[in-house]
Amino acid sequence: MELIGVLVAVALIIVMTQKGFKLYWSILAGIAVVIVSNRFSLEEILSIAYGSLRSPTMITLTLIVITLTAFGNLMKESGSLRVTMLSLSSLVKDPRYQMVILPMLIGLITFPGGAVFSAPLVEEAGHKLKLNRERMVVANTAFRHIQYMIYPLYPGLLLMAEISPYSLYDYILFNLPVFMLFCLVTFKYVFRGVKVTGLIEGGLEDNNRRNELIKLLSSLSPLILIVLLVLIFNLYFPVAIMVGVLAALVINYPVGKPLWETARSRLNYLVKGINWSMTFSIIAILIFKDFLEQSKVIYDIMAVMMENNFPVLVLVVFLPFLTAFLMGNYFAAVGICVPLFIPLLPPGEQGLYYMALLFLTSQAGYFGSPIHMCNILTIEHFKASLPTVLKDVNILGAVLVLLGIAAFLVRFYLL
């Protein structure tokens, strides 16, 4: 009964998401199914929910999502990102590398519609290379997401580290060779057949190059500050982001505009930038995870797998991929799958290899999902063919899965 309840809950979450319901409503409906199927008493329901809401993981992730999305919108609306893009375009003359770096930089900062922000910049470089619209869409979405497997401020990676026994750095170290190979494959695939002879303009003079580099670093300084505070000084993530917010509030003030007016508008950008939908979704996912852990379903799954000698590796590859692909949401794939698999995995480093592979396969499914918002928005911007784009991004998604499996096998059996 409990196992059937979880299967129904996951199916309900997927169907409701595809029907246009907000993710957090879909997950709350799934929680209700788990509660009914497990016959939790009112006292148990309140105890689990209260414990989940006051847990350090819940508090940390909620604060991270609130502060990071507000920070991203502030960077966008204050003009800092625009300065970054213009300076980078002046420094990097090869249109191919512009198409790689511009979406990657935009992707470092979390704000809704980021794919649309980088799309015009990618389009300008793409026209120089005579790329078709579909290829430009693939470049914009692929290079926007490619660094997330090693980016320490990526919410999906932070969620993995918070709800599993392994650290952020464990995942980054496992993913690093996969990232490097996937970058190479993606670059070759996107720019296959492209000739750049005669398209690369002359470089800037030393003084101009220095000025543009200073502008670039200045515009990115709040983000650089956050990363340094976290990686070097091990500062609590939400506090580090707040320091970055304070830095973003004071840089690139417009000349000739009253100070109070600029300060007021930037505070407004900050408040309006909070992505409450993502915040509520994180809260719902963590509550769902805790109800799963308190149910008997995990033991039922373990019993079924042991009785049928079903390979865990196959499930780790397909279940997260399918969940992310159908829902177009990496949070849901990670939040649903990680609690199910942790009890099934071997302890120590071998368990890490499974968890890292789970993360990569969920990213591959999310990357190629037909309801992934970045795909939808970019296709709409370029007026591109949906089937062609989905074919290309899912070819790259399949490559990511294969590279993840290869890394797993090498680490598991050879190292």
Model-derived segments and spans:
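Membrane-interfacial loop-to-helix junctions in multi-pass transporters
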Residues: 1-4, 55-61, 87-100, 129-136, ...
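Membrane-core helix-loop-helix motifs of multi-pass transport proteins
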Residues: 129-218, 352-354, 374-410
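Alpha-helical transmembrane segments of multi-pass membrane proteins
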Residues: 95-107, 131-149, 174, 180, ...
